């Protein structure tokens, strides 16, 4: 019975997916830190644990944004996605992301499972047809989706509001609510015209989703977010009026395609089917997707939580195939760059192609892993990158490997020496090694890559301290102490073996080299974690001459990279200056005539203290704030959710327009407005310290 249980555990199937990257541009470091490096570390570890691992990903290639970008670039949508599919696939290879298969949603086999989902959901009563008014361009002779539309915000009157949300006040709305809507491409006026679409009735899944969620022990940030999201589930359109996408499988649906968020997660299934076909075993995919004993792990960024924790599970519940529901959902927070969000449009990013001309995949993998955004946002800085590379990889890890192996080559003819009688310090050292190996395994298995990277360096430092304290160079001077030297070096070799093992998921190139230096013929990736952990190094095994594992990152290189980043950002800013200046003149002079002092005096500006802050349901931009303005406490809805965390707002003194007429924003009545300064990609509330709530501002 015990053997059967062990066999079941050892052969457990683990299906790992990373969120499909959108083939609308090249990847950047922020993407890698969220869904790809953590997944790859987990996959590599579980393979070492001899689990039946299948790691699947692919390009997400449909959607309105693709057609918009392709139009602007003068390419067809297919040419556009072909370009970025291959660029991103190449980046993944350079980063050594070990997908078992990397697919794409434009491959013909993706259509069948997508249609199967739609037909099942329709027949089971979870999809219904509705006719709604949508914005239509008579000039272009087509309906325009949100991304193609601009107009006047129905809330604050800003004239360049986007089709789904206002960048000025943060309000979310339907594109049909815009005043004076016009085409983003041609500036042509738009009219409302009825059109038919199909809606997924997500509200029908609230109860089963909540019951299913109760069985999960996910990160608190995931559970807390998705509970609120499920509470507000409602019917969502799953079709669009366009040509680029998966067709709607109904006879009266010409010119309609399935919305990208509907078909994209089905790409996990179609990619697995393609993998099986390429192996010549057409039904092999069923072993993973249709077996309830399979462990399904979806690695995503936090912006994908709604789709993977509610919408796609609802789609699976509503169709007829016994597909696996996700078991684990490691959702990471955002990874920023030098204090700001990565932004290609703002020139605030690191070009991966350029990066690989100067640095290695191990360097960036370790730098990201050691500061992974697992529970809160984190950031990449060039100074920190230099510190991680020089102090950790070179100074601790590389130094230990080099000094031990060079010493053995010089004193032991390049062979693993025999250990003598262990002293208490030796036994403690070897036990600490085993403990750290176990801790690393626990960290990898629970998606704690950051902790695993710390353990890796703790083991490196443990070996360095032991080597220094035992002073084998002194024992080498006398024949009667060489036995002691051999014992020290044998223990150090055990440390290097363990170090190669636990570091392989994070820095596979360096770890594999260390493994080869130790004289092993079998590639490390094919080894068994538990066997390597307990087996001793063979006596007299011939070791290889060590090579340099890591290069130093010089100050000049860091200064060059920071300057390059600043220049790229400045170039982007200059290119946008003419348009920005034109908009500024239009908004600040033409739209806002001069006022006299009496008009200004009509405003009641007061200091308010924020005492509560809560996200507004169904809005990414808005917070509902409870503000003390001295004479009373008021609800104020503010579009600051992108720029402030709840804890940053509590207790903050702000300036409130206290006599503004109440306005309804996303179902919440706002009794005022906060003053803020808004720059390119940033917003700061006007704050006044050390002044009592209710104080007048003039």
From Swiss-Prot:
A motif ('KMSKS' region) lies at residues 341-345. Residues 599-698 form the tRNA-binding domain. It catalyses: tRNA(Met) + L-methionine + ATP = L-methionyl-tRNA(Met) + AMP + diphosphate. ATP binds at residue 344. Keywords: Aminoacyl-tRNA synthetase, ATP-binding, Cytoplasm, Ligase, Metal-binding, Nucleotide-binding, Protein biosynthesis, RNA-binding, tRNA-binding, Zinc. Zn(2+) binds at residues 153, 156, 166, 169. Pfam families: Anticodon_3, tRNA-synt_1g, tRNA_bind. InterPro entries: Anticodon_Met, Met-tRNA-synth_bsu_C, Met-tRNA_ligase_1, Met-tRNA_synth, Methionyl/Leucyl_tRNA_Synth, MetRS_core, MetRS_Zn, NA-bd_OB-fold. Binds 1 zinc ion per subunit. It is found in: Cytoplasm. Its cofactor is Zn(2+). A motif ('HIGH' region) lies at residues 21-31. One of its GO terms (cellular component) is cytosol. One of its GO terms (molecular function) is ATP binding. The keyword Acetylation does not apply. It comes from the Bacteria. Belongs to the class-I aminoacyl-tRNA synthetase family. MetG type 1 subfamily. Homodimer. PANTHER family: METHIONINE--TRNA LIGASE, METHIONINE--TRNA LIGASE, CYTOPLASMIC. Is required not only for elongation of protein synthesis but also for the initiation of all mRNA translation through initiator tRNA(fMet) aminoacylation. This is Methionine--tRNA ligase. It comes from Protochlamydia amoebophila (strain UWE25).
């Amino acid at each position: 019975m015990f053997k059967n249980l062990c066999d079941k555990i050892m052969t457990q199937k683990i299906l790992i997916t990373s969120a499909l990257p959108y083939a609308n541009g090249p990847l950047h470091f922020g993407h890698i830190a969220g869904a790809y490096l953590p997944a790859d570390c987990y996959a590599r570890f579980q393979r070492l644990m001899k689990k039946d691992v299948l790691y699947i990903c692919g390009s997400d290639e449909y959607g309105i944004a693709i057609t918009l970008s392709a139009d602007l670039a003068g390419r067809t949508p297919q040419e556009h996605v072909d370009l970025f599919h291959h660029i991103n696939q190449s980046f993944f290879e350079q980063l050594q992301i070990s997908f078992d298969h990397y697919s794409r949603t434009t491959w013909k086999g993706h259509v069948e499972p997508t249609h199967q989902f739609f037909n099942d959901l329709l027949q089971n009563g979870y999809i219904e047809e509705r006719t709604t008014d949508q914005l239509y361009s008579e000039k272009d002779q087509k309906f325009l989706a949100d991304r193609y539309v601009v107009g006047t915000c129905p809330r604050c009157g800003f004239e360049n509001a986007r089709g789904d949300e206002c960048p000025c006040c943060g309000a979310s709305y339907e594109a049909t609510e815009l005043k004076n809507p016009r085409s983003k491409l041609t500036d042509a006026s738009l009219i409302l015209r009825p059109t038919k679409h199909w809606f997924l009735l997500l509200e029908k899944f609230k109860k089963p989703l909540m019951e299913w969620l109760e069985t999960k022990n996910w990160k608190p940030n995931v559970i807390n977010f998705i509970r609120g999201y499920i509470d507000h589930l409602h019917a969502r359109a799953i079709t669009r009026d366009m040509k680029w996408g998966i067709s709607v499988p109904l006879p009266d649906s010409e010119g309609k395609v399935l919305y990208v968020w509907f078909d994209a997660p089905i790409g996990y299934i179609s990619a697995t089917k393609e993998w099986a076909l390429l192996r010549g075993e057409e039904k092999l995919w069923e072993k993973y997707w249709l077996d309830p004993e399979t462990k399904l792990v979806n690695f995503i960024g936090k912006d994908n939580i709604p789709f993977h924790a509610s919408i796609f599970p609802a789609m699976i519940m509503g169709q007829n195939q016994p597909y696996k529901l996700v078991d684990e959902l490691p959702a990471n927070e955002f990874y920023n760059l030098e204090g700001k969000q990565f932004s290609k449009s703002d020139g605030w990013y690191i070009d991966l192609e350029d990066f690989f001309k100067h640095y290695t995949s191990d360097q960036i993998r370790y730098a990201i892993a050691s500061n992974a955004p697992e529970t809160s946002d984190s950031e990449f800085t060039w100074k920190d990158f230099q510190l991680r590379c020089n102090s950790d990889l070179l100074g601790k890890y590389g130094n230990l490997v080099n000094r031990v192996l060079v010493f053995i080559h010089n004193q032991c003819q390049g062979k693993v020496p025999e250990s003598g009688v262990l002293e208490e310090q030796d036994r403690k050292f070897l036990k600490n090694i085993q403990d750290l190996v176990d801790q690393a395994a626990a960290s990898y298995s629970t998606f704690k890559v950051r902790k695993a990277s710390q353990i890796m360096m703790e083991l490196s430092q443990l070996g360095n301290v032991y080597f220094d304290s035992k002073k084998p160079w002194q024992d080498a001077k006398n024949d009667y102490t060489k036995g002691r030297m051999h014992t020290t070096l044998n223990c150090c070799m055990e440390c290097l073996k363990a170090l190669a093992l636990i570091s392989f998921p994070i820095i596979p190139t360096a770890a594999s080299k260390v493994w080869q230096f130790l004289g092993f013929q079998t590639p490390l990736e094919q080894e068994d974690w538990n066997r390597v952990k307990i087996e001793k190094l063979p006596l007299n095994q011939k070791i290889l001459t060590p090579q340099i594992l890591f290069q130093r990152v010089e100050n000049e290189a860091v200064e060059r990279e920071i300057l390059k980043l600043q220049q790229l950002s400045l170039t982007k800013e200059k290119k946008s200056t003419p348009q920005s200046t034109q908009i500024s003149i239009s908004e600040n002079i033409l739209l806002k005539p001069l006022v006299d002092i009496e008009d200004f005096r009509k405003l009641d500006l007061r200091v308010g203290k924020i005492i509560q802050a809560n996200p507004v349901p169904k809005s990414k931009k808005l917070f509902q704030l409870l503000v003390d303005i001295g004479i009373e406490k008021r609800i104020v809805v503010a579009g600051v959710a992108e720029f402030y965390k709840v804890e940053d707002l509590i207790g903050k003194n702000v300036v409130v327009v206290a006599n503004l007429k109440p306005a309804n924003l996303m179902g919440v009545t706002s009794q005022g407005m906060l003053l803020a300064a808004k720059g390119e990609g940033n917003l700061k509330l006007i704050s006044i310290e050390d002044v009592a709530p209710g104080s007048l501002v003039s």
